[in-house]
Amino acid sequence: MASNKVVISALLVVVVSVLAATTTMADHHQEQVVYTPGQLCQPGIGYPTYPLPRCRAFVKRQCVAPGTVDEQVRRGCCRQLAAIDSSWCRCDALNHMLRIIYRESGAADAGHPMAEVFRGCRRGDIERAAASLPAFCNVDIPNGVGGVCYWLPGTGY
């Protein structure tokens, strides 16, 4: 008889725990938590249309002469990257920034990693510099590995 009471008590504890967890999950989802970027990570919505001007300057200088970047430019870049409200949108903003750099220099949006974007700077080098900015600036990105954005050339991911 005592063992039946223990079993019933244990089952009751499990049921109450499950109900509490379910209520917590329901409350959490009513707050409309966004888990993926979807339509929000677009120029002018999730980040500025002309994003990260300090990061553009930083990446260009890093590409041409690694290690020679002004501390003020580096801090400005990190501030601009951290200011993007949704951490999900940071890699998209960096990818959009790269496309702007390519257009400004007359390079195609997609191309061979060894192709020169501008004098002394290859596409692969500038892409690696941009992709590693979240880790360098110590800002959160939920869609990268070790703080490094990953994307396939020309796709934005």
Curated annotation (Swiss-Prot):
Disulfide bonds join C41-C89, C55-C77, C63-C121, C78-C137, C91-C149. PROSITE patterns: CEREAL_TRYP_AMYL_INH. Keywords: Allergen, Disulfide bond, Secreted, Seed storage protein, Signal, Storage protein. The keyword Iron-sulfur does not apply. Coiled coil: none annotated. GO terms for cellular component: extracellular region. InterPro entries: Allergen/amylase_inhib_rice (IPR002411), Allergen/soft/tryp_amyl_inhib (IPR006106), Allergen/tryp_amyl_inhib_CS (IPR006105), Bifun_inhib/LTP/seed_sf (IPR036312), Bifunc_inhib/LTP/seed_store (IPR016140). This is Alpha-amylase/trypsin inhibitor RA16.
